[in-house]
């Protein structure tokens, strides 16, 4: 299946605030330390997500993590905690750019390390198993990623 959106008109706008969404604290820790980000007050008393923020050069950088599961004490992972954390952070911070970062299941066996960056050309869902006839392929899916030639160019020249 091809991407639903092939092109979007992008207006030139200075990016003053970047929000990075990262599910797990261990994934976020190197970025938090490198940028010396400080924890902000809770987004919502009932939401476990945590926001960190600070300045890098002349840009505000915020990181939101999904927080811990109150029952099991592990990092909240998956689409529901990610959606909630992202929504609440966007609502509170109004960022210019949102980056979803993480390992999406991890690639340590393939040599990936925390901090490595990858630009995908395709994506699939590995947490949407739907055992209903006709929904299996939809649930796992295999979709083209939105084309990002400028991001790829920047990452190759960095």
Give, region by region, the residue ranges found by the protein language model:
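Structural motif
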Residues: 97-99
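Mid-sequence, gly/pro-rich, charge-dense loop/helix-turn segments that line enzyme active sites
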Residues: 108-158
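Short, active-site-adjacent cap segments at secondary-structure transitions
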Residues: 27-29, 105-108
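N-terminal short beta-loop-beta anion/metal-coordinating cradle
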Residues: 2-88, 92-93
């Amino acid at each position: 299946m091809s991407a639903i959106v092939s092109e979007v008109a992008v207006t030139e706008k200075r990016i003053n605030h970047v929000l990075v969404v990262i599910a797990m604290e261990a994934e976020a820790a190197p970025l938090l330390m490198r940028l010396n980000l400080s924890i902000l007050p809770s987004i919502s008393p009932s939401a476990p997500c945590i926001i960190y923020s600070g300045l890098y050069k002349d840009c505000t950088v915020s990181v939101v993590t999904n927080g811990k599961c109150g029952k099991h004490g592990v990092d909240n992972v998956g689409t529901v905690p990610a959606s909630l954390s992202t929504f609440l952070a966007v609502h509170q911070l109004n960022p210019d750019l949102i980056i979803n970062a993480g390992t999406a299941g991890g690639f340590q066996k393939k040599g990936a390390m925390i901090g490595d960056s990858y630009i995908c050309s395709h994506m699939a869902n590995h947490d949407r198993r739907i055992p209903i006839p006709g929904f299996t392929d939809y649930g796992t899916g295999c979709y083209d990623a939105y084309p990002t030639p400028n991001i790829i160019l920047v990452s190759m020249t960095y």
